[in-house]
Curated annotation (Swiss-Prot):
GO terms for cellular component: cytosol. Its EC number is 4.1.1.49. It comes from the Bacteria. ATP binds at K201, H220, G236, L237, S238, G239, T240, G241, K242, T243, T244, E285, R323, S448. It is an enzyme of class 4 (lyase). It is found in: Cytoplasm. The lineage of its organism: Bacteria, Pseudomonadati, Thermodesulfobacteriota, Desulfuromonadia, Geobacterales. Binds 1 Mn(2+) ion per subunit. This is Phosphoenolpyruvate carboxykinase (ATP). Substrate binds at R60, Y195, K201, R323. The gene is pckA. It holds the Pfam family PEPCK_ATP. It comes from Geobacter sp. (strain M21). Disulfide bonds: none annotated. InterPro entries: PEP_carboxykinase_ATP, PEP_carboxykinase_C, PEP_carboxykinase_N, PEPCK_ATP_CS. Its main location: cytoplasm.
Amino acid sequence: MRFNDITRGSGLEQHGITNPNLIYWTSPTSVLYEQVVRRGEGLISHLGALTVKTGHYTGRAANDKFIVDEPESSSRINWGKVNRPFPPESFDHLYKKMTSYMQGRDLFVQDCFAGASPEHRIPVRIITERAWHALFARNMFLRATQEELLTHNTEFTVIDLPAFHAQPKVDGTNSEAFIIINFARKLVIIGGTSYAGEIKKSIFTVLNYLLPQKGVMSMHCSANAGEKGEVAIFFGLSGTGKTTLSAAPNRLLIGDDEHGWDDAGVFNFEGGCYAKVINLSPQSEPEIYQCTRKFGTILENVAIDTISRRIDLDDASFTENTRASYPITHIPNIVGEGCGGHPNHVIMLTCDAFGVLPPIARLTPAQAMYHFLSGYTAKVAGTEAGVTEPQATFSACFGAPFMALRPSLYADLLGKKIASHKVSCWLVNTGWSGGGPGIGGRMKIAYSRALVNAALDGTLGAGSFVKDSVFGLDIPSACPGLPADILNPRNVWSDKSAYDATAHKLVEMFRHNFEQFKATTSPEIASVL
């Protein structure tokens, strides 16, 4: 059998899969395009990107993710609302049903790698019933060469069957959708959802379990490098600007979402990007915008005119969470090998919808650990006209849904690396200024870029700072090219007493959330706020 072949028979017996119909082995992009169109899975847009719809699930099914509770990993897992236990016998029963379902069906297999570091990468296999999910895997993971395929010894397998629905009362799931990780069997099973992000995030969870046990810091962050190789990493939850701010014309992109930090430096886990594209414009985000016009890109839930085949990135009729999946090589300025040195700067991004955090602030190491464990951002509660009450969101390590181990373990690793390499740390608010929604305005992307650039090139560090009286943050007195009054958030509010009340309210939210970490952190970190 040649790689990229279409074969009858199995070759998948090691996974318990017998009697499938056609198997598309590591098919190239063009073949997968043909299969997507032939099977009615999507449409080709006028400039070549593939448009698909995910149906009911347009985002992650957070309540439907489980980890099998088995002896090998049970004591290490941070069990709770995020990492829900699933009985081994229920997993075996459900998996047997899935293997029966696959009999007589066409399957798409992609053999690839997770992790750009030769020392830490793991060979992964994605088996799916959807051609476009195979293309997603091909975009998002690191592609194996023909020579590497000869020795590709799969360490973790994802079996993805969107049309296979669980029976909650029988199978022990919360709904018809499920994402279940079994560390003992090195297997992930996904069913009942077509949202492709589940594939990449399940392997991200696997890496977040495996690598820290080897002393490698795993991170939900983007990363880029300057002309001289100086590296910056950007932590942040979805919608805070990781992808946007790391795809900068004056820097080389290492990766946009998932990275490791070992003794040699930073390395990308992926071979592609998964960018939010709602209201994307060529002016504010030119690099990402151009990717939505390229062959090989998958546009998830983006509106398309079925006659002209033109897309509308401003149309949120399907979801606000429209996405583009594309190989990182679609970006013109990248670090080709996906690896960089030790970071010079750590930037923690937040989208503060209360409008009380500064656009940028310098953090002490203790403050950096506090904000890393807090993982704060805020979302607008509703879409009604007028003022809406923001909702604070705290997600430990800026990625709690994907962190299988205890947050303190990740924080300890990060703290040691920051101290060892004397890393400068910054907090950047890409959210509101002058008040929340309906009162203030969203921070301009151009302002955030200018502030980040000034931090990375040393301009801010060489200047003076003023101490914020509420959050204890060091705020720069000036930034070239920006109005000085926007740097201190209190100055932008017309009602200063309203600012004070809102800021202190947010401080109390921080304190309440941090109670869970006090027992495992130093007094210096616990007393930051």
